[in-house]
Amino acid sequence: MEFSAKQIAAFIQGEIIGDENATVHTFAKIEEGMPGAISFLSNPKYTPYIYETQSSIVLVNKDFVPEHEIRATLIKVDNAYESLAKLLNLYEMSKPKKQGIDSLAYIAPSAKIGENVYIGAFAYIGENAVIGDNTQIYPHTFVGDGVKIGNGCLLYSNVNVYHDCRIGNECILHSGAVIGADGFGFAPTPNGYDKIPQIGIVILEDKVDIGANTCVDRATMGATIIHSGAKIDNLVQIAHNDEIGSHTVMAAQVGIAGSAKIGEWCMFGGQVGIAGHITIGDRVNLGAQSGIPSSIKADSVLIGTPPMEPKAYFKAAVVTKNLPDMQKEIRNLRKEVEELKQLLNK
């Protein structure tokens, strides 16, 4: 499909600087631009590329002021990254979607399948499962007994949704995601550990994204809940009875122990670890590799283990980097003190 700058500007409510008849048919990073491509500039680090990019159209923020002549047609918008997302979504929606049920898929007689559903080869749909309209289930995906999946969902190959779990509308589950495996619950005894049956479920509300090889464990009792709009990256572990607030985002390798409550609009960097049975307030930002042993109030910005404010953390990091030199200096000072003591004692 081909679009002109005029059509794109109308769709994203932007201002054209240049040729309104410039056309594009593909997307490209600004540093890899080519004729017929649309790119974007939102990170100032990439500003030098805008003067040499071969892209036909570039989305920029309204406050961008060129320092040199630019070959490309510019479209100025409030938020270039957000506008790019709108265009990419339009591009995705224009692609033809798979439909129909492959003859090699297994669907239990009691399962209920909505309209315009795609179920790929060797997918398994269990007894009393419900699949909503326009949902796509790719090959080799397992949907257990009693599972309910809403409308417009996308489950890529090798997703596993255990029995009785619930998935809302427009959720995306990437390959290898496991929803509803047993929580890590064991009772210590003199002879070892007795397994505690995990009889709860997992609930994913609307527009939740789950990354590849991420696990969301079922509750011991009740439900592990991920609220609407939350986005979870690859290789994340969410334990039994956790509750993740709406629109919270977590980068890869975050680990959350059981019964933690995470607020809305939080942002966790990669490899953050959260202790169990604590509460993280709304809009908390945690830097990568932070270890969180206790509850945190809303609107906090922390990094490190133990967690501290970024300014204090980076000061401590400088001190840590200089520890070998400081140790050497202290040893020399101790040696000098001992020599002075010996002189004074003579």
From Swiss-Prot:
Keywords: Acyltransferase, Lipid A biosynthesis, Lipid biosynthesis, Lipid metabolism, Repeat, Transferase. Its EC number is 2.3.1.191. Pfam families: Hexapep, Hexapep_2, LpxD. GO terms for biological process: lipid A biosynthetic process. Pathway: Bacterial outer membrane biogenesis; LPS lipid A biosynthesis. InterPro entries: Hexapep, LpxD, Trimer_LpxA-like_sf, UDP_GlcNAc_AcTrfase_non-rep. It is an enzyme of class 2 (transferase). The active site is at H240 (proton acceptor). One of its GO terms (molecular function) is N-acyltransferase activity. Homotrimer. Belongs to the transferase hexapeptide repeat family. LpxD subfamily. This is UDP-3-O-acylglucosamine N-acyltransferase. The gene is lpxD.
